Amino acid sequence: MEWNTFFLVILIIIIKSTTPQITQRPPVENISTYHADWDTPLYTHPSNCRDDSFVPIRPAQLRCPHEFEDINKGLVSVPTRIIHLPLSVTSVSAVASGHYLHRVTYRVTCSTSFFGGQTIEKTILEAKLSRQEATDEASKDHEYPFFPEPSCIWMKNNVHKDITHYYKTPKTVSVDLYSRKFLNPDFIEGVCTTSPCQTHWQGVYWVGATPKAHCPTSETLEGHLFTRTHDHRVVKAIVAGHHPWGLTMACTVTFCGTEWIKTDLGDLIQVTGPGGTRKLTPNKCVNTDIQMRGATDDFSYLNHLITNMAQRTECLDAHSDITASGKVSSFLLSKFRPSHPGPGKAHYLLDGQIMRGDCDYEAVVSINYNRAQYKTMNNTWKSWKRVDNNTDGYDGMIFGDKLIIPDIEKYQSVYDSGMLVQRNLVEVPHLSIVFVSNTSDLSTNHIHTNLIPSDWSFNWSLWPSLSGMGVVGGAFLLLVLCCCCKASPPIPNYGIPMQQFSRSQTV
């Protein structure tokens, strides 16, 4: 037991020695009272949505945003100036144009009976596609896919005739402004480092070019720097309208030719005091990877942030219901709305599918009596953002004679039950299926398609019927003729035979 305690103490010392800590004893005259905590606003609504980022997702791909509360107990704050490198989802550098490259086998199967009747079935088979093959085929032109003519052999079943096709489907994906990685729900784990990018569909790769390096324009904001009273350790920086920037594990990194402080979540900031003097000088980062972060990242390891598990549990329950039932209601979908302003994922329903894309969420501080408009933190009144002319809006909103906002409607004593109506979700089809059908079976490597009628397939089913009837009729007629034309046996004679005598003979 004593040895275990000794090794535990040594381990704690090692961890503390390897964790960069920023300490600062702020002058008493600079300490200010900061009462505002990072509270959940009345509502959050998406703005600056990038339409081309919205793609259909399966229920299993839904993800609950992290909910948290920021408590300033035991901290003192000093006013400071913070330079922040913002990441806007509307930036032109945040997208990459490309296309999906498919490799599939179009198969025609023919079965022929004794009488010539034929059954023709068309199917599409997913074909394996290697990364190198995707690279080689990406720059080539490919013909539009088609099924081969059937190969039918008398009294043979399941005669296959295959043809393999490559073809392209245009697709724009998101790009991480920091790491230059490609982001899309269709990718394995939703992220890809370099093109070609493998998708969760076998035989489908995304191919595109990485945009040129781009350095966002920084913004200078007035905020506060927070220090713990007992050890004078700097723990966070806060600016109104932004999520707290944790500094318990902060370090410095060079990006776009400038030295930045990399926060606990990976944001890049600079902290300066009055007159532009530098206030923080953390150690150099061991991990210099820079990637785009948002307001919905994991705050659970930060000591000064308390995760709001009540709201998160509601979202997890909604996710469980949607996944188990294959149905979704506006109320359930509203649980996936980020409750804090900043970059986030927005959802809406379209033709039985859940669409998800990138938006900037802004805080709503007031809603007018008829819910036609909302007021933002800068006292600007705005109209609710709609998805084209659909009645289903972002995060479960329903537009109609009355605007229904599930997270507001749930507080009414008499609420609109329309938000509780569940609708069936349709499967997200394989990309190849758009050429032949609207349904697919993604649970196997075989894409099932029903019999696809065409001119020649119809003729193949008609003539065997006529020929079969002719064969049967001819055989019956031949049997009748054979029976009728067969020679009859001689008729037996039962009379008394008469003898023939010569004329000269007297009887």
UniProtKB/Swiss-Prot annotation:
Query: Which GO terms of type biological process are on file?
Result: symbiont entry into host cell; virion attachment to host cell
Its protein name is Spike glycoprotein
GO cellular component: a single term: membrane
Taken from the record's topology, the Intravirion segments are: 483-507
Which InterPro entries does the entry mention? Rhabdo_glycop_CD (IPR055447), Rhabdo_glycop_FD (IPR001903), Spike_prot (IPR002417)
Keywords for the protein's UniProt record, in alphabetical order: Glycoprotein, Host-virus interaction, Membrane, Signal, Transmembrane, Transmembrane helix, Viral attachment to host cell, Viral envelope protein, Virion, Virus entry into host cell
Q: Give the stretches traversing the membrane.
A: 462-482
* Primary role: This protein forms spikes on the surface of the virion. It is responsible both for the binding of the virus to susceptible host cells and for inducing the uptake of the virus by the cell. The interaction between the internal components of the virion and the portion of the glycoprotein exposed on the cytoplasmic face of the plasma membrane probably directs envelopment and virus budding.
- The reply to whether Nucleus figures as a keyword in the UniProt entry is no
| Signal peptide boundaries | 1-20
Subcellular location, record wording: Virion membrane
List the carbohydrate attachment sites: N30, N378, N389, N438, N459
Membrane topology, as annotated, equals:
Single-pass type I membrane protein
Q: Which residue stretches are annotated as topological domain Virion surface?
A: 21-461
What organism is this sequence from?
Viral hemorrhagic septicemia virus (strain 07-71)
Q: Provide the family line.
A: Belongs to the novirhabdovirus glycoprotein family.
Check the record and name the SUPFAM superfamilies matching this protein.
Viral glycoprotein ectodomain-like
